[in-house]
């Protein structure tokens, strides 16, 4: 399956896809096994799987007639970098505020 680049934030914007990632964090599953957890058609589940694959969150391995889905750690790097950036941003801001408040209380 050819992998297209998809915005990872858009990919995780759907609650069904986030739940699929949670399920796959426990074990690799076939698309049919994933579909059993949702009140949607198998083609709809396949569409969500394709989006997660295109965003790099999962890998798909064909084994006979079944397609096995697994999490792909590399797919989460962009999200982690974005979160780390803003985590550092807020830590710096809060440290400055803390320093300022401590200065004022010492006066």
Briefly describe each language-model feature range.
Residues 62-68:
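Short, Lys/Arg-rich nucleic-acid/phosphate-binding segment
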Residues 18-20:
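Pre-recognition alpha-helix immediately N-terminal to the DNA-recognition helix
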Residues 1-6, 11, 22-37, 42, ...:
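C-terminal regulatory/oligomerization modules of transcriptional regulators
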Residues 14-15:
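Helix N-cap at the start of a conserved alpha-helix in ABC-type nucleotide-binding domains
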Residues 48:
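Residues within the DNA-recognition helix of helix-turn-helix
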């Amino acid at each position: 399956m050819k992998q297209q680049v998809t915005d990872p934030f858009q990919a995780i914007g759907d609650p069904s896809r986030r739940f699929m990632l949670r399920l796959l964090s426990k074990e690799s599953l076939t698309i049919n096994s994933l579909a059993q957890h949702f009140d949607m058609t198998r083609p709809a589940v396949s569409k969500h799987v394709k989006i997660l694959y295109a965003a790099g969150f999962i890998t798909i391995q064909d084994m006979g007639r079944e397609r096995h889905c697994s999490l792909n750690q590399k797919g989460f790097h962009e999200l982690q970098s974005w979160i780390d950036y803003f985590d550092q941003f807020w830590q710096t801001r809060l440290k400055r505020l803390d320093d300022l408040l401590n200065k004022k209380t010492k006066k």
